[in-house]
Amino acid sequence: MERFVLKFLLIDKVIAVCLDQKISNERLNPLTEYFFWPQRDAWEDMKNFIDNNDWIDPKDAVNILNRITEVINFWEESAQLKKEDIKNLNIKFPDCVFIVM
């Protein structure tokens, strides 16, 4: 997943995820809007986006979807995450960006 970055918004009882493409070490190109969970199926929304963009390597697609699953599962198991939990998230998922609202 070195070509992509997943960004997660943690909002009370909602988690949202979007996908950005790395252009350089410091520049990102947003590829998707934020997809929300649990109001909608963020995983399925991301899968639909990936399926409609054949330039995304299948290996990257699997890694992106697996990472979304891992983060959502961690978020659900942790009940509600607090701002101080971001450090643990960054350690557990160093390839993702987390923003607590």
From Swiss-Prot:
InterPro entries reported in the protein's UniProt record: PSRP-3/Ycf65_sf, Ribosomal_PSRP3/Ycf65
GO cellular component terms, semicolon-separated: chloroplast; ribonucleoprotein complex; ribosome
Keywords assigned: Chloroplast, Plastid, Ribonucleoprotein, Ribosomal protein
GO biological process: translation
Ranges annotated as spanning the membrane: none
Matching Gene3D superfamilies: 3.30.390.140
Single GO MF annotation: structural constituent of ribosome
A Pfam family matched in the record: PSRP-3_Ycf65
Subcellular location: Plastid, Chloroplast
Main location: plastid
Role according to the record: Probably a ribosomal protein or a ribosome-associated protein.
Assembly mode: Part of the 30S ribosomal subunit.
Family: Belongs to the chloroplast-specific ribosomal protein cS23 family.
Name of this chain's protein: Small ribosomal subunit protein cS23
Provenance organism: Euglena mutabilis
